[in-house]
């Protein structure tokens, strides 16, 4: 596939944004025409992620074409308007949620992983690929947020090894942690 559109769920989180952006960076490094469409606002805490400004929201009435639509971190029906707006030759769904309805034409589903970004890490390695710092930063962010910064019970030795691999590339966990834990004034006041 030469043209690839990546998407994820409405109400995007670290794993959905990290997996789509990280894979976008990787695919572009392989010479592919890759873009990210997400049918929702992107939370401000993710503004530190490389390429965040390139995430597009599908424009009403606009048709998008691609050789491949990759739906990350969610089943197809939770992508908002994206699924209806994209004409793709093939649809691939990559997810770690056991609740996935398995409706995609092609599905890579593995609930043993803590995050879709952890799956992406292994898929890139399985293809013999390597990570740029931009892709590694995005994938690390998704793994960190879906594991509560490696505190939740879904954190496995494999998760930690994958995170360590990304840190060796140059990811700065402290910068990501501080950015993800920042709260807006309204969020702080809501807790008072």
What are these regions, as identified by a protein language model?
Residues 1-10, 22-28, 102-192:
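A structured phosphate/pyrophosphate-recognition subdomain
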Residues 4-65:
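Anionic-ligand anchoring segments at beta-strand to alpha-helix junctions in alpha/beta enzyme folds, i.e.
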Residues 13, 23, 46, 70, ...:
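Divalent metal-coordination and catalytic microenvironments
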Residues 32, 89, 129:
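Short glycine/serine/threonine/alanine-rich loop segments
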Residues 37-39, 72, 94-96, 111, ...:
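Generic beta-sheet signal
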Residues 50-52, 58-106:
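Active-site cofactor/cluster-binding pocket
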């Amino acid at each position: 596939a030469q043209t690839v559109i990546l998407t994820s769920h409405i109400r995007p989180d670290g794993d959905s944004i990290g997996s789509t952006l990280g894979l976008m960076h990787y695919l572009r490094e392989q010479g592919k025409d890759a873009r990210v469409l997400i049918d929702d606002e992107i939370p401000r805490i993710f503004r530190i992620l490389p390429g965040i400004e390139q995430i597009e929201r599908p424009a009403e009435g606009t048709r998008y074409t691609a050789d491949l639509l990759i739906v990350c971190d969610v089943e197809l029906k939770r992508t908002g308007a994206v699924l209806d707006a994209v004409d793709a030759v093939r649809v691939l769904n990559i997810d770690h949620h056991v609740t996935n309805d398995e409706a995609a034409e092609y599905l890579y589903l593995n609930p043993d992983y803590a995050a879709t970004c952890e799956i992406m890490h292994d898929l890139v390695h399985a293809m013999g690929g390597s990570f740029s710092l931009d892709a590694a930063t995005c994938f690390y962010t998704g793994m960190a947020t879906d594991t509560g910064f490696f505190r939740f019970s879904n954190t496995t030795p494999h998760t930690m090894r994958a995170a360590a691999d990304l840190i060796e590339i140059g990811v700065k966990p402290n910068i990501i942690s501080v950015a993800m834990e920042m709260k807006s004034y309204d969020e702080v006041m809501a807790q008072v």
